């Protein structure tokens, strides 16, 4: 054992404790007494106002005798007083406001400027009354010593100029401006004059501008202060648009050329940006002889002596390319492109092994400037593709694009990720050139980059899968080999972060995957992940996004066995899950299924599991189900679903009679009233439900076509796998037998018309199925997955009904429906044992059916229902 520590080390004696207490008592004595109130009784008395005063009287009193904070409150409330009682406000309150503003502080001045602007925008008074009462107050405070206050009043005045008549502008603003713009006035006064002149040019005719405004403009362009010259230069764009092309060429352009050679860098920068913005006004000669040499000079000086213009130059490169397109000689074109490439890698060549803390501040500032330049280059990359022609992208710009996608700075990669969709559109068939860069950005370590990329991820992937010369099917399998690992890694990275909105957005965008990759790839790589997110994630919007995307995956899954497995998982793990949270998510999933699938699909698989939750022990689950019941009822069709309607009504009655939770009971009562008001949809088309029934019919057709496609693929695989002798024997057998015998035994025939059909008709039936399947493959997956409630257009409907040669609509639908029933009976996976069957609700189960038909009780009633629907368009 270790020896005990010495007594000195354990300082917990009674004396030491008393010493601590004495120290604490001393601290309490030193403490200053805390005031119980922030205001003294005298101050409270001064701030108290008689509550019987009207709003106008209270405002007058506070502006006269109140404190500054009370006066500011009255001025902030001035727009309300103007709306309530404009006459009294103008007569009694506004004079007090004028008096208060003479000695007001910054806060009251800013509040007044904002209130005056609000009154103008609200149109509480006429323009004439506003001019008479408010304009002089605004003009009086334009030259306030505080720059922020002066700018606030200036913004108000510029808005007032938009609505004032010409005569008022001339007498109240333009005439006084002549003296305000003189050199004898303050710099602030001349700066204000520059901005007012830029606004006035759009209000007068060219003659007045030439005679009264342009002399002032020239004078201010040659002002001794660089701030004034720069400010006036930035207003030349507005002035040029007001005076027309001729005066711009003769007056504005010479001033811009002179200002572009100014000694002040801010003036040169303003001149350059104004020239770029005015490119469309100048003709080809002016661009080639005057502006192009200036741009060339700017580009050369930017690297040598004037780096301050680099950021602006890189930002306006796109406009320059567009405005000077067709003017460059081949040599100038090449030099400009090389200049852009140089900007894209600016600062990347300067490698150093210093720590960021050891880098001098000047170097850090320069690196920030270079990052901004590269970011602007990324922003203008689509414009540069147009500049070099997309056909030359690989030779001219691919290496630059590669550098931007791999830039060490996040803002650069973020910007190029935003532009990625535009780049993909411009490349069109050459989009395959940037496959690797898409994967790189999907795997980027920064979630900001991923978030920017996924905004247009469905459109990008669609271009990737359909671009080039190969077909859609080939692209789905071969063109993006690294896409699936990149997508899964991106989702896992988003899930591991705290940025759940990015995760939610990514899951929503995954709904486009059925158009890009195969059904099996989605099933094995993404479906289980959606289940995991629904079961384990803690963020509700993320869970809902995963649920909706899973429903879309299920909607376009092309294997019935996989579909059944997913449905069973949804019901067992969510609908019958131990956690009430999972059962709530099951109801969310049911809502998405109602939206995405046909009514018959929901009724067959999810109707009964959903209404069984009326017996759930958790009140929140029952409450959520009550909100969903109107949508559940809307999936029923009478008379085929009469038995389901009876079960729904029985569950609602039990809730009304047995519900003990008062909140749930209140919602049940409201839901019952809503259910009673609902009109039921019939099997036959009704005028009021025509559009909804048509959309539902289209969804059902697509679901049946998926089954047909699966059956055709299996038949094709079986035929491809048999020996040649078997195929020859089958061909001879088909030639000698009747068409009815040549069809599979488990598909009953329901074809009206003659009993004998030629062998060619059998081929036409299969051919029509193949045509419909191919048309569905080409059309159904092109739907906008964000709006799946809007199904395929009428063209697909026409293609479906007119593709059958020699047979009517009834026969085709009968065959399709029979195959649907047969698949239900024959292709259920082995995991579905008789003891735990997949919950299924069939319409018309009360009718008896010959068990030899297809093994499903509802085959004939279902067939009749479909026939009646198709025969009543």
Swiss-Prot record:
HEAT repeats: 213-251, 252-290, 392-427
Transmembrane segments: none
Residue stretches of biased makeup (Low complexity): 747-762
Bias (Basic and acidic residues) ranges: 713-737
Modified positions (Phosphothreonine) in chain numbering: 797
Gene Ontology CC annotations of this record: ciliary basal body; cilium; cytoplasm; cytosol; intracellular membrane-bounded organelle; protein serine/threonine phosphatase complex
Keywords: Coiled coil, Cytoplasm, Phosphoprotein, Repeat
Keyword hit for Phosphoprotein: yes
Coiled coil: 686-720
Phenotype when changing residue 618 to D: Abolishes interaction with PPP4C
Superkingdom of origin organism: Eukaryota
Chain intervals for the UniProt region annotation (Disordered): 713-766, 822-873
Family matches, as PROSITE patterns: HEAT_REPEAT
A GO MF term: protein serine/threonine phosphatase inhibitor activity
Any Gene Ontology biological process: blastocyst hatching
Subunit structure, as described in the record: Serine/threonine-protein phosphatase 4 (PP4) occurs in different assemblies of the catalytic and one or more regulatory subunits. Component of the PP4 complex PPP4C-PPP4R4.
Record function comment: Putative regulatory subunit of serine/threonine-protein phosphatase 4.
Record-given protein name: Serine/threonine-protein phosphatase 4 regulatory subunit 4
Source species of the chain: Homo sapiens
